């Protein structure tokens, strides 16, 4: 699908996200069944999560604590009084034929989240605030496995696994403040950073721990009324969120340009075709016939409880980014990269605490170590090079004991085997040559051995300076102090 640029500039996209975050509690939201993802099908079930007659649910307090902590992290208003409701619908993976959720009195309302948008070319960071309508608690449904296809259409039969039934979820509903696929993907990533920093979820989209539904409409620029809203499901990565939105924006613009109707419907993103396809007519809240859950009492959060949970909050990603910029003098981009993962941020801070320069450590973590982790598909907690050893390596460069080139040469061995950089440098005899007399002697010998190059240099071919510097580096095995070598070569060649 292609759309002319002039048509794109006539319209703007109005986008909101509904994000479901699966919590990492040991037991389900209303019963004691395990939430283990890898268990065999239909083994983590009981009469409560299967909805047998006469059973009574009991709220897992950890779910409430997680909801309040995330509510505080998104700058929301925590309700002192809220309740659960029954959301009624029929589907094969919902054994009770209703889902316990929250409707008109959610646990959190009126929040916001600041996102950062990175220009890929300049690495410049701009910030935007996205409103959050509400956050509420609910139970997950089961899971259908379609044999012979990844969708119901085309499958020979379907199997149902109720292990996921009753697993606790937090649903976070944004305001329609997003305007592009990039903004939506970044918003979802910032939510994932929050839940990981809080330790309440692993935020793994591939395993369904974080699921995003997109609501999107198009309207002419300047128009206040919203267009017809379309929901998009089935996106299991941040890039899929961005691509699905970009496709849907083009599809809706093309429909408007051709005077074709846009229907209020739910559409699925198909990764294989890179398209959205119609799934069903979109339901409204009245279709679910919500009413208060009679088997659960209302929830009351006391001021004392709220203060207790506030004190348990860690330093959050946005706070850490601001501190890195102010305390360490890092760019907004480097601060963002370092704080994307809490373990990476902790590693970085430990290396700086060992006495190394904050900016130099940032360069090593975001470039060389990040490349090693990416190439070997490792988390930073899995490498044997301790942050203290990285700090020691950086300090060897700062003091002139070794050059940056030598540091890069020994880094692979340190990453594979660990140990002390100082001891490794001494063992290999790789200490940087910074002695003036020793370097002068080497340079004199090289100039004497290359009279033709010297004559050409003095005749105007000044780029031959690099030849002489290269010969010094070659003769010393890269151990010559680069700055001092350049200065001395300049002096000798001009003399």
Curated annotation (Swiss-Prot):
Q: Which PROSITE patterns has this protein been placed in? A: GATB (PS01234)
The protein's enzyme class: ligase
Highest taxon, organism lineage: Bacteria
**Pfam families from the entry?**
GatB_N, GatB_Yqey
Alphabetic keyword roster: ATP-binding, Ligase, Nucleotide-binding, Protein biosynthesis
As its record notes, the protein acts as a catalyst of: L-glutamyl-tRNA(Gln) + L-glutamine + ATP + H2O = L-glutaminyl-tRNA(Gln) + L-glutamate + ADP + phosphate + H(+); L-aspartyl-tRNA(Asn) + L-glutamine + ATP + H2O = L-asparaginyl-tRNA(Asn) + L-glutamate + ADP + phosphate + 2 H(+)
Q: Which GO terms describe its molecular function?
A: asparaginyl-tRNA synthase (glutamine-hydrolyzing) activity; ATP binding; glutaminyl-tRNA synthase (glutamine-hydrolyzing) activity
Question: What transmembrane ranges does the database entry give?
Answer: none
Name any Gene Ontology BP term: translation
Q: What does this protein do?
A: Allows the formation of correctly charged Asn-tRNA(Asn) or Gln-tRNA(Gln) through the transamidation of misacylated Asp-tRNA(Asn) or Glu-tRNA(Gln) in organisms which lack either or both of asparaginyl-tRNA or glutaminyl-tRNA synthetases. The reaction takes place in the presence of glutamine and ATP through an activated phospho-Asp-tRNA(Asn) or phospho-Glu-tRNA(Gln).
Q: Which family does it belong to?
A: Belongs to the GatB/GatE family. GatB subfamily.
PANTHER family xref list: GLUTAMYL-TRNA GLN AMIDOTRANSFERASE SUBUNIT B MITOCHONDRIAL AND PROKARYOTIC PET112-RELATED, GLUTAMYL-TRNA(GLN) AMIDOTRANSFERASE SUBUNIT B, MITOCHONDRIAL
Describe its partners and assembly state. Heterotrimer of A, B and C subunits.
Q: What is this protein called?
A: Aspartyl/glutamyl-tRNA(Asn/Gln) amidotransferase subunit B
Q: Which organism is it from?
A: Rippkaea orientalis (strain PCC 8801 / RF-1) (Cyanothece sp. (strain PCC 8801))
Its lineage reads: Bacteria, Bacillati, Cyanobacteriota, Cyanophyceae, Oscillatoriophycideae
């Amino acid at each position: 699908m292609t759309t002319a640029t002039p048509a794109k500039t006539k319209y703007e996209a109005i986008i909101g996200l509904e994000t479901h975050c699966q919590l990492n509690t040991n037991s389900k939201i209303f019963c004691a069944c395990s939430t283990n993802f890898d268990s065999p099908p239909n083994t983590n079930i009981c009469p409560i999560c299967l909805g047998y007659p006469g059973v009574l649910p009991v709220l897992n307090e950890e779910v409430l604590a997680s909801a309040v902590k995330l509510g505080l992290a998104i700058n929301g208003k925590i309700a002192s009084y809220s309740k659960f409701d029954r959301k009624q619908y029929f589907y094969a993976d919902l054994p009770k034929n209703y889902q316990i959720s929250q409707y008109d009195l959610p646990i959190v309302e009126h929040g916001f989240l600041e996102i950062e948008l990175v220009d890929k070319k300049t690495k410049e960071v701009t910030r935007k605030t996205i409103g959050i309508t509400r956050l509420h608690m609910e139970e997950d449904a089961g899971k259908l496995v379609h044999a012979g296809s990844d969708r119901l259409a085309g499958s020979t039969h379907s199997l149902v696994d109720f292990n996921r039934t009753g697993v606790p979820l937090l649903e976070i509903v944004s305001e329609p403040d997003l305007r592009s696929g990039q903004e939506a993907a970044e918003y979802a990533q910032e939510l994932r950073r929050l839940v990981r920093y809080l330790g309440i979820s692993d935020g793994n989209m591939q395993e369904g721990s974080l699921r995003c539904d997109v609501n999107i409409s198009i309207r002419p620029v300047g128009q206040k009324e919203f267009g017809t809203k379309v929901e998009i499901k089935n996106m299991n990565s941040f890039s899929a969120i961005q691509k699905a939105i970009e496709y849907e924006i083009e599809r809706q613009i093309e429909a408007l340009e051709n005077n074709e109707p846009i229907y209020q419907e739910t559409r699925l993103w198909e990764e294989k075709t890179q398209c959205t396809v119609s799934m069903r007519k979109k339901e409204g809240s009245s279709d679910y016939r919500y009413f208060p859950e009679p088997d659960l009492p209302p929830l009351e959060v006391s001021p004392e409880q709220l203060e207790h949970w506030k004190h348990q909050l860690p330093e959050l990603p946005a706070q850490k980014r601001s501190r890195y910029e102010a305390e360490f003098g890092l760019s907004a981009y480097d601060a963002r990269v370092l704080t994307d993962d809490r373990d990476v941020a902790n590693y970085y801070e430990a290396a700086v605490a060992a006495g190394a320069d904050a900016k130099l450590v940032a360069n090593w973590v975001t470039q060389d170590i990040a490349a090693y982790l990416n190439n070997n598909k490792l988390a930073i907690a899995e490498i044997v090079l301790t942050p203290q050893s990285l700090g020691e390596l950086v300090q060897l460069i700062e003091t002139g004991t070794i050059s940056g080139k030598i540091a890069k040469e020994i880094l692979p061995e340190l990453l594979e085997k660990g140990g002390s950089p100082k001891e490794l440098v001494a063992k290999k005899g790789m200490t940087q040559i910074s002695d003036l007399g020793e370097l002068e002697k080497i340079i004199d010998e090289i100039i004497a051995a290359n009279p033709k190059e010297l004559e050409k240099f003095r005749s105007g071919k000044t780029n031959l300076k690099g030849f002489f510097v290269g010969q010094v580096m070659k003769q010393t095995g890269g151990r010559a102090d680069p700055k001092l070598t350049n200065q001395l070569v300049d002096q000798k060649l001009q003399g």
